[in-house]
Amino acid sequence: MTLIWRHLLRPLCLVTSAPRILEMHPFLSLGTSRTSVTKLSLHTKPRMPPCDFMPERYQSLGYNRVLEIHKEHLSPVVTAYFQKPLLLHQGHMEWLFDAEGSRYLDFFSGIVTVSVGHCHPKVNAVAQKQLGRLWHTSTVFFHPPMHEYAEKLAALLPEPLKVIFLVNSGSEANELAMLMARAHSNNIDIISFRGAYHGCSPYTLGLTNVGTYKMELPGGTGCQPTMCPDVFRGPWGGSHCRDSPVQTIRKCSCAPDCCQAKDQYIEQFKDTLSTSVAKSIAGFFAEPIQGVNGVVQYPKGFLKEAFELVRARGGVCIADEVQTGFGRLGSHFWGFQTHDVLPDIVTMAKGIGNGFPMAAVITTPEIAKSLAKCLQHFNTFGGNPMACAIGSAVLEVIKEENLQENSQEVGTYMLLKFAKLRDEFEIVGDVRGKGLMIGIEMVQDKISCRPLPREEVNQIHEDCKHMGLLVGRGSIFSQTFRIAPSMCITKPEVDFAVEVFRSALTQHMERRAK
C-alpha cells in the first residue's frame, strides 16, 4: 500500500469514555497481570489508528521465566525501559506487538534503526531469497550482493567519497574511521563534542563523552572533548540558530546572515585546538545532529568553519551518520549535507540494514590507500551476502516509497505539532530536530531550564507506554524524549502520538498540583 493511501485510510479518532485497554487476543495469556491504562485518569483518551495486520499467536517463554533468564544469564548492564519491561513478540511496519497481544506505535524504531518499517514485505522477501542462496563467504571470495550494494551506496555520496569498507556496527565503523584518520595524518589527537556518542567499544569510548559510558580505567588515548555548541542548553544561542522548523524559546538579536552564537562556539573550538591537542591533529568526529545526547543541533555554519580549522591542522573530518543518514532528516539524504560540508570520512550503521547487523565506512581513495599501507584490514562478517542483499533492498524501498520526502513532510508536521505542546506546557523546555529525528526536552520550568527530575520523566514515559506509544530517552540526565519512528510513518499516527503526549503531560501536571 502506498504512503498516500495509508495517510488517507488512517483517520484519528478520539474516545471520551473510560480508559481504553490496549488490544489483546482473547486466547493469549502468560499467567501474569497485564499492563492496562486503568491507572490513568479519566481524560479524553487517544484511540490508536487502525492496523490491518494480525500478529501470530505467542507460544514461547512465559513472562516470569523471561525475567528469570534475563537476571541469571544476560548482562547485568543491559537495562530495559519501564517498570514492567515489554516482552515484544512481532513487528509490522511502524507497529510492535507484545506477547500478550497489545499493540504499540513504535516511535523509536529500535534506537533509530528500523528505517523502512518492521518486517517490511520487500526487505523480508529479499532476505528470504538470499537465505536460500548464500549466507556467508567472507571477503576472500567475491559475491554479487556485495558488489551490487557497493555500487548503489557509492552513487548516493558525492565525489571523492567512493571507497567503501563494510563492517557490522556503528562502533566498528567509528573505530575503523579513527584508524584511517591516524594512518592518513600520522597524528594521534582526535576531537569530539561533549555529549557525543560514537560507540561503546574500548577504542570509541574515548570519543564518547557521556558520563554513563565513561570508566574509571584509562582508555581512548588521544581523544579530546570540546564544548558542544548546544543553542538551547549551552551558554549561547537563540531563536534564529538552528536548521529546524522550530527554534529555541531563547531570544537573540542575530541578523539572518550572521549567527553570534556560532562565532562564540567557534572561539571555544579554537581554544581546544590551542590548549588541548598537538599542533597537528588526526581528526574531528561529529554527528550532524547528536542522537544519544537528546537530538542536539548546532548553530548554522558551525560545522563548516570547524572543518576548515581541523584541516588547517592537518586533520581529517569524520561525519558520524549512524543515526542521521539514509533520508531520515528529510531535506537531504545525509546529515552532513544539511551543514553544507564535505567530510573526508563518513560512517553509517543502524538504518543501513533496517535492523540487520550492518555498517559501513566510506572515504576517499587517498585515505583508503593510507590505511592499506599500514594495516591489512579484514572483517569476517563485513560484506556478508545477507547483509548486502538487505542493504540493497532498504535503499530501493527508500527510493520507491519516497521515504525521504515522507520524512520531510511528516517530520515537519510533527515538529510543529509538538512545538504547540511546548507553548502549552511549562515543563516542555525545548522541541527540536529535523525530519524524523526529534527531541522533546523536559524541564522544571522555562526560566531556570533545570532538567525535570528523572523520576518525573519516568512517569511520563510510563504513561505514554500505557496508552500505546513507545518513545526513546536521551540527554545527560535522561530528560529528553527522543522521537525517531520508521520513515513510513503517517500524519494520523503523528496526531495520535501528539495526543498521547498531551494526555501524559496533563496527567503529570495534575500529579504535581496535588
Curated annotation (Swiss-Prot):
Its cofactor is pyridoxal 5'-phosphate. It is found in: Mitochondrion. It is an enzyme of class 2 (transferase). Residues 1-41 form a transit peptide. GO terms for cellular component: mitochondrial matrix; mitochondrion. SUPFAM superfamilies: PLP-dependent transferases (SSF53383). Signal peptide: none annotated. GO terms for biological process: glycine biosynthetic process, by transamination of glyoxylate; glyoxylate catabolic process; L-alanine catabolic process, by transamination; N(omega),N(omega)-dimethyl-L-arginine catabolic process; positive regulation of nitric oxide biosynthetic process. One of its GO terms (molecular function) is (R)-3-amino-2-methylpropionate-pyruvate transaminase activity. Keywords: Acetylation, Aminotransferase, Mitochondrion, Pyridoxal phosphate, Transferase, Transit peptide. Its EC number is 2.6.1.44, 2.6.1.40, 2.6.1.18. Expressed in the convoluted tubule in the kidney and in the liver hepatocytes (at protein level). Pfam families: Aminotran_3. InterPro entries: Aminotrans_3 (IPR005814), Aminotrans_3_PPA_site (IPR049704), PyrdxlP-dep_Trfase (IPR015424), PyrdxlP-dep_Trfase_major (IPR015421), PyrdxlP-dep_Trfase_small (IPR015422). The modification N6-succinyllysine is found at K71, K262, K304, K417, K420. The modification N6-(pyridoxal phosphate)lysine is found at K350. Coiled coil: none annotated. It comes from the Eukaryota. The modification N6-acetyllysine is found at K71, K84, K262, K417, K420. It catalyses: glyoxylate + L-alanine = glycine + pyruvate; (R)-3-amino-2-methylpropanoate + pyruvate = 2-methyl-3-oxopropanoate + L-alanine; 3-oxopropanoate + L-alanine = beta-alanine + pyruvate; 2-oxobutanoate + L-alanine = (2S)-2-aminobutanoate + pyruvate. Multifunctional aminotransferase with a broad substrate specificity. Catalyzes the conversion of glyoxylate to glycine using alanine as the amino donor. Catalyzes metabolism of not L- but the D-isomer of D-beta-aminoisobutyric acid to generate 2-methyl-3-oxopropanoate and alanine. Catalyzes the transfer of the amino group from beta-alanine to pyruvate to yield L-alanine and 3-oxopropanoate. Can metabolize NG-monomethyl-L-arginine (NMMA), asymmetric NG,NG-dimethyl-L-arginine (ADMA) and symmetric NG,N'G-dimethyl-L-arginine (SDMA). PANTHER family: ALANINE--GLYOXYLATE AMINOTRANSFERASE 2, MITOCHONDRIAL, PTHR45688. Belongs to the class-III pyridoxal-phosphate-dependent aminotransferase family. Homotetramer. This is Alanine--glyoxylate aminotransferase 2, mitochondrial. It comes from Homo sapiens (Human).
